[in-house]
Structure formats: C-alpha cells, structure tokens
UniProtKB/Swiss-Prot annotation:
One of the protein's GO biological processes: rRNA base methylation
Binding site for S-adenosyl-L-methionine: 170-171, 202, 224-226, 302
Name of the protein this chain belongs to: Dual-specificity RNA methyltransferase RlmN
Keyword Ubl conjugation included in the entry's annotation: no
Entry's cofactor comment: Binds 1 [4Fe-4S] cluster. The cluster is coordinated with 3 cysteines and an exchangeable S-adenosyl-L-methionine.
Homology family: Belongs to the radical SAM superfamily. RlmN family.
High-level lineage: Bacteria, Pseudomonadati, Pseudomonadota, Gammaproteobacteria, Thiotrichales
Any one GO cellular component localisation term in the record: cytoplasm
Origin: domain of life: Bacteria
Family matches, as HAMAP family: RNA_methyltr_RlmN
PROSITE patterns, per the entry: RADICAL_SAM
UniProt keyword list: 4Fe-4S, Cytoplasm, Disulfide bond, Iron, Iron-sulfur, Metal-binding, Methyltransferase, rRNA processing, S-adenosyl-L-methionine, Transferase, tRNA processing
Domain (Radical SAM core): residue spans on this chain: 103-340
C-alpha cells in the first residue's frame, strides 16, 4: 500500500458514530454519516464519484481524505445445491472465506473473523491451518459487502441475505475488538438493517466474551460444544482446558437470562463416528444441558484431508437425536450444504493453506480477546 493511501481514512469498517466523527473532522454535518453509509453498504458503492446526491466539492474532499477499501475476489465457487463460496484476499499474503447458504425461508451468510484459528479444534480444517492474525473491521464487513453486491441485493427489495453467522474461519470472541463493531454495522438501518436475532456469533467457549455479548450486543449466540464431558471436550476443543464445562455452562445461563428479549442458545454438536455419538454421550448431554433454553444442532462431520475422524452413520445420528427429543431437548440435524466446494461446516480453509501466510505460534488467549 502506498504512503498516499495509508494517509487516507478507510470508511468501509466504520460504524455510524465513527463516520459522524470523521465528517465532523473535515467540517461536515452529522447527516453525512448516514448518507455515505447507505451508499457504501446498501448500494455497494466504493467510488465517491458514484454518490450522486453528494456535492461535487464534498466528493472531491472525500477522494483526498478517505477511501473505501474492498478485498480482491480470488475465486467464486457455486455448489450444486446453490451454496456460494468466495475466497477473498485481504492483503498480499492472506485469504479468508465467506459462504452464502440459500434456503427457502432465508439466506444465510457465514463470515470469517480471523485468518486461521488459534483454537486447534481437532475435527476442524481451519483449526489445523494455524493462526495468523485477527481480521480488522473492514475485512469482516467486506465479506458482507462482497456477497451483497455479488448477489445483486438492492435497498427496499426482499432480502437475499437475511441472516449472518460468525461461523467461518476463526474464533469471533477472540477478536471482539473487531467483531462487535462489525455486528453493529450489520444491524444499522443505514447499512444492512439486520435484527439482533438474525446476527449470530458462534464461539468455542471464550467465557469472558460471552458475558460481553450479553452486556453490549444482545445478538444470538451459538456454542460449539461437540462433547458432553470435560475429558472428551479437552481432546476435541482444547480451549475447554481453560474454560471447562463447569465454567462455560453458567455463562450460557447468564446469557439467556440477560438482555431485553427472550433468548436461547444454539448448541452445535459435530457427530464423529465412535467418538462422541453413542447413546451414553446423548444421556450425558441431556444432563449437561439441564434446563438451559437451547436448540441442539447435530452436524454430520465433513471430512478434510489428513483427518482420522469419520462421519457418524445416519442410524447413529438419528438414534442420538431421538434420545434428545425424548428427553424434551429441541434438536435438529443440519443438512450438509456446499460440501462439493469445501464450503460445509468444518471445511473452510481446507484448500486455502497455500494462499495463506501460515503462522504457527503459541497464542496468549487472554491477550488475544482483550
């Protein structure tokens, strides 16, 4: 990036308050923030000259002081089932993936929050990639910007992207500095106007940040549980050694009890053959969840290169589901989507390693989530 560009303010990742402050700094009135925000996010404009209801003098001023940075689209892959995966280059070395999953009643965009992941979950392709860095505001919201533009989304028309889930590459709650402001942009009526219940942050269990969601965002929460006891979860989801179940579960109860709206937690549980899919595991899960308002989402494992795990049989999955349902636990089996383009759950980054600057490092989790 040239020094000339470095001196400019990047507007893509700014929320309305930040944009208002920026316009004040260049002698403009507060209403300009909402005006420009609509152009950027609702109309997909990245060139100030296209903002036709803004004076020529202001467009010239913006061109000298600001920019709207967008990522390079390295590839777009379309699955037979309609799923679309974008590989986006956010700098000269790093790529991230975003996935759009169309359904009859909604369209869900799955976005990434980090380049790689520090948590090293043993069944996840991204976890085997290693961790490089957190994504910045603009790099996260750019995934929505790209998808919105690629899908031809327009203001005042029926939403194509109705839901956004932070379930792509990385652990969102180890990057609250950037995921939280991005969530606010997604929910701003001058940007994408999503309701709080249509924005979901998924976590492997970063307990201090779960409490921050309740306090400052009030969006939906999904927990990547995957095991009903500490011994097995230590193996599958290593962050459990730092935040074991006896610490995690009370945090989930605090989440559903806080805020202004009735909440539940989505519990993600990947089904691994002869690892966590037996009826004894189902019974342990029933006891663990207790009276927590939740929905369990059973996820058939999606294989990736060099993994020893296998997908549970359909019979095992449905036995597990039936046991939960009989105990009164709301449970569904996720339909695998996009596996033919490596866009299914757990497959992201499986073929991105060569395009990503891999950094194997010991990560201080406390420092990372701030």
């Amino acid at each position: 990036m040239s020094d000339k560009i470095k001196d400019k303010v990047d507007l893509l990742g700014m929320d309305r308050a930040e944009l208002t402050e920026f316009f004040a700094s260049i002698g403009e009135k507060p209403f300009r923030a909402a005006q420009v925000m609509k152009w950027i996010h609702q109309f997909g404009v990245s060139d100030f000259e296209e903002m036709t209801n803004i004076s020529k003098s202001l467009r010239e001023k913006l061109s000298k002081t600001a920019l709207i940075r967008t990522p390079k689209i390295v590839s777009e892959q379309r699955s037979a089932d309609g799923t679309i995966k974008w590989l986006l280059e956010v700098d000269n070395h790093n790529c991230v993936e975003a996935v759009f999953i169309p359904e009859k009643s909604r369209g869900t965009l799955c976005i990434s929050s980090q380049v790689g992941c520090a948590l090293e979950c043993s069944f996840c392709s991204t976890g085997q990639q290693g961790f490089n860095r957190n994504l910045e505001n603009w790099e996260i919201v750019a995934q929505m910007w790209v998808a919105n533009k690629a899908l031809g989304c327009k203001p005042k028309e029926e939403r194509i992207i109705s839901n956004v889930v932070f379930m792509g590459m990385g652990e969102p709650l180890l990057n609250v500095k950037h995921t939280f402001p991005t969530a606010r942009i997604l929910m701003d009526d001058n940007a994408y106007g999503l309701s709080k219940r249509r924005v979901t942050i998924s976590t492997a269990g970063v307990v201090p940040a779960i409490d921050k969601i309740k306090e400052s965002l009030d969006v939906s929460l999904a927990i990547s549980l995957h095991a009903p006891n500490n011994a097995l979860r230590d193996e599958l989801v290593p962050i459990n050694k730092k935040y074991p179940l006896e610490v995690l579960m009370p945090a989930l109860h605090r989440y559903v009890e806080g805020g202004h709206s009735k909440k539940h937690v989505t519990v993600e549980y990947v089904m691994l053959d002869h690892v966590n899919d037996r009826l004894e595991h189902a019974q342990q899960l029933i006891e663990l969840l207790g009276d927590l308002p939740c929905k369990v989402n059973l996820i058939p494992f999606n294989p990736f290169p060099n993994t020893d795990y296998k997908r549970s049989s359909n019979n095992a999955v449905h036995r597990f589901k039936d046991a939960l349902m009989e105990a009164g636990v709301n449970c569904t089996v996720r339909r695998t989507r996009g596996d033919d383009i490596d866009a299914a759950c757990g497959q992201l980054a499986g073929k991105v390693k060569d395009r990503t600057k891999r950094t194997l490092q010991t990560v201080n989790l406390d420092k990372l989530h701030g």
